Amino acid sequence: MRYAAIAGFIALGWLLFFRTPGPGEVSAAARSAATAAGCGDLEQPVVPDPSRVHLAPGESFDYPDRPAAAGPHDAAPLPPDPHVYPIPVPETQGVHNLEHAYVIIYYRPAAEGGLDQETIDRLAAIARDEGRVIMAPYPALPDDRAFALLAWNTRWMCPATISADQAITMATSFIDAFRGTSVAPEAPHGLLGPLFQK
């Protein structure tokens, strides 16, 4: 009996501290919102066998497919605060955050034919309230896209016509499915990992 209890504690400890949860599925509601908004498919993987090489300080990288969801990246990630950046961020640093199981919300600003301000504000509220979520403008999104959700080697992009409700439905489901999971090579460990994501 004693050995069974010890084995149980060891198994529980492994689950709580070492096992990283796998990625989930985006909800049917999120997929329906994406279809109604005219979004592209959920891309996974974005690139086969992405590199995880750290670039030298100050070194840039020309990602062949943007916004980049994986690949060579800066040795330093973006700081977790602020969660919402008012200006574009260095893409090489953002990719490093993705490697650590963050989700990034990129958008084209309204002044550049992108998302309306209500949608931006509502997405920013989600980013501020969630750990391991960063939001920043990304003016270089493809011409027909104004909103992108990224996790490591995972991307979902939508046009500017997406409504605030559709964007919120997609973002919350995407965050739940991919943040802090083993889809990222350097995700936090253990089922308790998400408790420390803020």
Predicted segments, located by residue:
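Short linear sequence elements within intrinsically disordered, low-complexity coil regions
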Residues: 8, 19, 66-68, 112
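Mid-length scaffold segments of soluble, non-membrane domains
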Residues: 83-134
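Surface-exposed, low-hydrophobicity interaction/linker segments
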Residues: 24-26, 30-93
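Intrinsic disorder/low-complexity signal
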Residues: 17-25
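Helix-rich interaction surfaces within compact, conserved domain-sized segments
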Residues: 25, 125-198
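Hydrophobic membrane-insertion alpha-helices, especially the h-region
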Residues: 2-18
